[in-house]
Design a protein with these regions (language model features):
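Conserved beta-loop-beta element that borders a ligand/cofactor-binding pocket
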Residues: 1-19
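Residues that recognize and position ribonucleotide moieties
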Residues: 9, 41, 100
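Short beta-loop-alpha junction of Rossmann-like oxidoreductase domains
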Residues: 19-26, 77
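Alpha-helical substrate-binding/gating segment
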Residues: 24-32, 37-65
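Amphipathic alpha-helical segment in the mid-to-C-terminal domain
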Residues: 45, 75, 112-116
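Mid/C-terminal beta-alpha module of Rossmann-like enzyme folds, strongest
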Residues: 49-104
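Amphipathic terminal alpha-helices
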Residues: 119-126
């Protein structure tokens, strides 16, 4: 019964990426890759930690936040770039549906939170 408490902060996280955690490793193993036109909704684990710290340090009443990096390339664009960066391989996708963009702006407005780890900075992710 969390909603009965006077203070709570619920973080709804996008797909998590970080050191030793990148979905491109699993996608490379698949023969068929679906929904290349769908956007990615990802968040770096360092930004998740900062979001948690902002919730703990700035007490607000009853808040629920989506935590998702504000850039949303397509799956085909994003994972193909990652595959080239890490493995010097090209990936192909079936186009499929576009999907939903998850917006994580509310936490930026209400808690002075900043997304500081770009999902396209591949250097430390594998």
């Amino acid at each position: 019964k969390i909603k009965e408490r006077s203070h709570y902060c619920i973080l709804r996280l996008a797909g998590l990426i970080g050191p030793n955690r990148h979905p491109v490793k699993f996608l490379l193993k698949q023969e068929t890759r679906e929904n290349g036109a769908a956007v990615v909704n990802l968040i770096h684990q360092k930004d998740v930690i900062q979001a948690i710290v902002s919730c703990i340090s700035q007490e607000k009443n009853q808040a629920i936040y989506n935590v998702c990096y504000p850039e949303h390339p397509t799956r085909a664009e994003y994972y193909n770039e990652a595959a080239k960066f890490y493995f010097q391989q090209e990936m192909t996708f079936n186009s499929g549906e576009k999907g939903k963009i998850i917006l994580g702006k509310k936490i930026e407005k209400e808690r002075k939170f900043k997304y500081s780890n770009k999902i396209t900075d591949f250097g430390d992710l594998i």
